[in-house]
Structures are given as C-alpha cells and as structure tokens.
C-alpha cells in the first residue's frame, strides 16, 4: 500500500527526532540529512518541518504535558517511543484539525514500524490517556457514540 505524504512526513520526523534525542544535533543538521533520506520527495514538507521544529522547540512543554500519562520517567523510554509520543503530543496540542484517533493511529503505526515488539501497545495506552486530558470534548463525544 502506498504511503500518504503525511505518513511519510511523520516517519521522517520520527527518524529526525530519534537522531536529535540521541545526538542533540542542531535542527538544521537534521534537516539536511532528512532531505537526502529515502522518501523525502514524497513527504508533506510543511508538516515535516512543523513537527520536527515544533517538537524540538517545545520539547520541555511537550514532556511536561506527556509526563502525567506515563508510568515511568520519559528518559526511561526507548528513543523511538519518546520520539513517537512527542510527535503525537505535538499534534494533539497544535493540529486540532486532525482527529485525535487519526493521531493515535498514526503514532501506533510509527511505533510498529520503528519500535520494539510491544512498544506500540504502550504508545496506544499512553495516548488514549493523554487525548482524554488534552481533547476531552472530542474523546467524550466519541465514547458516547
């Protein structure tokens, strides 16, 4: 199945954030490397930039929003799970036009693609809790049918 431009952007953002989390390289350096990555030409570049730079810029705020939904300190998570959760937290708070279920589903798929064998289950559980806090009206409406 062909990946959407938005999915491709999220995959590249995950790779870029993984690199940033491990190396703390400047975002411009990460940008340059991503431009040479497979699939860059098919990505929604505006979304990729918004996510990558937004997560790096607002890292501390996103971690603060995410922390109450975690069962352990964020630095004990794998870098892949951290990157995926930070992307989803950024999208939940900044891309309110995107339904929360879409954001969670995309995050689960990223965790399946890049993470450990059961990491996607953890990501799903954390984001369900987080979405209920960040988007209570939307999540309640979905639960009420």
Curated annotation (Swiss-Prot):
A Gene Ontology biological process term: DNA-templated transcription termination
Name this polypeptide is given: Transcription antitermination protein NusB
Annotated organism of origin: Burkholderia cenocepacia (strain HI2424)
UniProt signal peptide: none
GO MF term set: RNA binding
Function of the protein: Involved in transcription antitermination. Required for transcription of ribosomal RNA (rRNA) genes. Binds specifically to the boxA antiterminator sequence of the ribosomal RNA (rrn) operons.
NCBIfam families: nusB
Entry keyword set: RNA-binding, Transcription, Transcription antitermination, Transcription regulation
A cellular component annotation (GO) from this entry: cytosol
Stated family: Belongs to the NusB family.
Keyword Disulfide bond assigned: no
Organism ancestry: Bacteria, Pseudomonadati, Pseudomonadota, Betaproteobacteria, Burkholderiales
């Amino acid at each position: 199945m062909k990946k959407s431009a938005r999915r491709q952007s999220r995959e590249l953002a995950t790779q870029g954030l993984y690199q940033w989390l491990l190396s703390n390289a400047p975002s411009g350096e990460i940008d340059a490397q991503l431009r040479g990555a497979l699939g860059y030409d098919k990505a929604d570049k505006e979304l990729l930039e918004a996510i990558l730079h937004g997560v790096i810029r607002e890292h501390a705020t996103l971690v603060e929003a995410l922390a109450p939904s975690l069962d352990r300190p964020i630095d004990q998570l794998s870098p892949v799970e951290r990157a995926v959760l930070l992307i989803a937290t950024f999208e939940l708070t900044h891309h309110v036009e995107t339904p929360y279920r879409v954001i969670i589903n995309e995050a689960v798929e990223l965790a399946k693609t890049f993470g450990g064998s059961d990491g996607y289950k953890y990501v799903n559980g954390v984001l369900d809790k987080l979405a209920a806090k960040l988007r209570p009206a939307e999540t309640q409406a979905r639960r009420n049918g």
